[in-house]
């Protein structure tokens, strides 16, 4: 007979999973048989005793029958197996009923458990959902703030990007403009380089030509120096002869005066003629006022002296009374003279000449004089410069020129530099240049640092009078390279 010793019921509930089915097994543990039933998530385990002491009533009990070495009778074994089969069948039916009962009861419990679990799960899920909603709302708010910050930052970055883009476009435009300008400058530089090379070639040719002209001029200057030395010798001889002639003239004048004195005792008309011959003129203004109104050569005397000088008087221009102190008209007289020659004068008073610095200095030192410079170019144009006050210092001050009050048509600016400059000649360099202007520009003049004028320069004929540095020039009328055709310098008392 089987006895139920131990029954173990275990049920494990898992909400998340559900499994249906049954499993039966037989295990042997500690001398007992184990019977397990699986239904869904529940597991039922039964421990049954061994069947060693179960025997039929007709059989005698034999302890430890299983362990005996002698075999049982065949019939007895069959009976026992049949009994065991019956017992197993009964147990199986009983277990099936028990299983059905457990299943019926467990269904209700499972429904309740599942409902409770669902309710608990629902509450938990609602709570979790609420928390999630709250967290989501908080996260949404934070995301909104972050989004606003990101939007602001993005807007600011977009503005900066736009500004950078505009700056970049502006820089690109400037770079393009500069590139274009550089290209133009490169083209211009190439053109200038080519032009410079051409000019260098021309300059080399011109230098060669100038060198040849220089050699020719040096030869010509050497010849001219020889001629000048010869002329100086002749001039010295002529000066000596002139002194002799002046002495002879003086002796003749005394003889004539003696004769006139003797004749005046017998005829009064001769006495009147002698008085007329003894009239003395300091300048042409005095001669004009005395009734001599015809232009020509007159004899003038130095102030406070009996020394005489021949001068040309212009009695027609601007009311007359002009004493001509310089004239250039045809190039017949060489004006490249020494200091002494410019002091005493040279040339023909009726033609080209220089009256003399000493006479002009003494005359203009007595009272106020005006200076008029008349100019004529090769195209027939005429102009003049009139100075309201003019005088020359003495020889100790190198016949320094003084001018004031310029008017006229030969330029609004004086071509004779002011304040006064000293007079220079080829043998007396008194200019303000380290070079010798008189030798470079030829002629004697009131040079500054060579200056804007020289009316005593070299005379050049027509069609050879341009681009001449050493010609007869008056800068503020015709420029520095134009050599004039004719010039006249004349003085007259300011109170004439």
UniProtKB/Swiss-Prot annotation:
GO terms for molecular function: metal ion binding; receptor ligand activity; receptor tyrosine kinase binding. CDD domains: FReD. GO terms for biological process: angiogenesis; blood coagulation; cell differentiation; gene expression; negative regulation of angiogenesis; negative regulation of blood vessel endothelial cell migration; negative regulation of cell-substrate adhesion; negative regulation of positive chemotaxis. Residues 275-495 form the Fibrinogen C-terminal domain. SUPFAM superfamilies: Fibrinogen C-terminal domain-like. SMART domains: FBG. Residues 1-18 form the signal peptide. Ca(2+) binds at residues 429, 431, 433, 435. The gene is ANGPT2. It comes from Bos taurus. This is Angiopoietin-2. It is found in: Secreted. Glycans are attached at residues 90, 120, 134, 152, 241, 304. One of its GO terms (cellular component) is collagen-containing extracellular matrix. Interacts with TEK/TIE2, competing for the same binding site as ANGPT1. Interacts with ITGA5. Interacts with SVEP1/polydom. Interacts with THBD; this interaction significantly inhibits the generation of activated PC and TAFIa/CPB2 by the thrombin/thrombomodulin complex. Keywords: Angiogenesis, Calcium, Coiled coil, Developmental protein, Differentiation, Disulfide bond, Glycoprotein, Metal-binding, Secreted, Signal. Disulfide bonds join 284-313, 433-435, 437-450. The Fibrinogen C-terminal domain mediates interaction with the TEK/TIE2 receptor. Residues 167-249 form a coiled coil. Binds to TEK/TIE2, competing for the ANGPT1 binding site, and modulating ANGPT1 signaling. Can induce tyrosine phosphorylation of TEK/TIE2 in the absence of ANGPT1. In the absence of angiogenic inducers, such as VEGF, ANGPT2-mediated loosening of cell-matrix contacts may induce endothelial cell apoptosis with consequent vascular regression. In concert with VEGF, it may facilitate endothelial cell migration and proliferation, thus serving as a permissive angiogenic signal. Involved in the regulation of lymphangiogenesis. It comes from the Eukaryota.
